UniProtKB/Swiss-Prot annotation:
Designated name of the protein: 1-(5-phosphoribosyl)-5-[(5-phosphoribosylamino)methylideneamino] imidazole-4-carboxamide isomerase
Family per similarity comment: Belongs to the HisA/HisF family.
The gene coding this protein: hisA
GO molecular function: 1-(5-phosphoribosyl)-5-[(5-phosphoribosylamino)methylideneamino]imidazole-4-carboxamide isomerase activity
Any coiled-coil regions, as ranges: none
Source organism (scientific name): Acidovorax sp. (strain JS42)
Any one GO CC term of the record: cytoplasm
């Protein structure tokens, strides 16, 4: 089970939002590269970056912080990034800079042709982030709920060559209320590509529950507020996940 620390970037700093609200942000660090090194040293095997300003602006905004993170840990562990990725040039620049995966969210739903082109041009590097509430997909930093069913869209994206799906339950994100295991497993069972759980990770109990469903296709989990608030010790959680997997 991949435990993936999240580093959310706003104005060059590491922050956490509550339910995607830019006005409800808590700053957890002024030095994103140092934060990346901290998680790598704690045993992280992948990092999850979000360019929050970019997500809302529709274009990359935290380039200096992202570059610093890649310089610090990019040669040690894979790094994935979402937020503001709307064109092929942006993807190419990020991959050339050392990013392993780009995460396409809103643009995948609103501009499926772009996602198709991205999968063709950068096969193996494209992850789709699907944010949902009650099984329906949301877009635009969660501000708009669509009529699309998560499973239907994910199957279509799988056919186009997406590497994996990050599934976020937006009713739970940043709330420490527990991962929506049932919905995550339901999606994973409908697909042949891996699903990464996100939204609401509260503590070790969630990690243990996720390890039980790893064989269903749940490859990992994004670790956000819980590892910053102290509700989850990241190194201990990764060690426990490895123990449960018999690693």
């Amino acid at each position: 089970m991949l435990l993936i620390p999240a580093i959310d970037l706003k104005d060059g700093h590491c922050v956490r939002l509550k339910q995607g609200d830019m006005d409800q942000s808590t700053t957890f660090g002024e030095d994103p590269a140092a934060m990346a090194r901290k998680w790598a040293d704690a045993g992280a095997r992948r990092l999850h970056l979000v360019d929050l300003n970019g997500a809302f602006a529709g274009q990359p905004k935290n380039k200096a912080a992202i570059k610093a993170i890649l310089a610090e840990v990019g040669s040690d562990i894979p790094v994935q990034l979402g937020g503001g990725i709307r064109d092929l040039d942006t993807i190419e620049r990020y991959i050339d800079a050392g990013l392993r995966y780009v995460i396409i969210g809103t643009a995948a739903v609103k501009n499926p042709g772009f996602l198709k082109d991205a999968c063709s041009a950068f096969g193996g590097h494209i992850i789709v982030g699907l944010d949902a509430k009650d099984g329906k997909v949301a877009t635009d930093g969660w501000s708009k709920l669509t009529g699309h069913e998560v499973v239907d869209l994910a199957r279509k994206f799988q056919d186009w060559g997406v590497e994996s799906i990050i599934y976020t339950d937006i009713g739970r994100d940043g709330m420490l209320s527990g991962i929506n295991i049932e919905a995550t497993v339901k999606l994973a069972q409908a697909l042949t590509i891996p699903v990464i759980a996100s939204g609401g990770l509260a503590g070790m109990a969630d990690i243990e529950k996720l390890c039980e469903v790893e064989d269903e296709g749940v490859e990992g989990v994004i670790c956000g507020r819980a590892i910053y608030s102290g509700d989850l010790d990241f190194a201990a959680a990764q060690a426990r996940a490895d123990e449960l997997a018999g690693a």
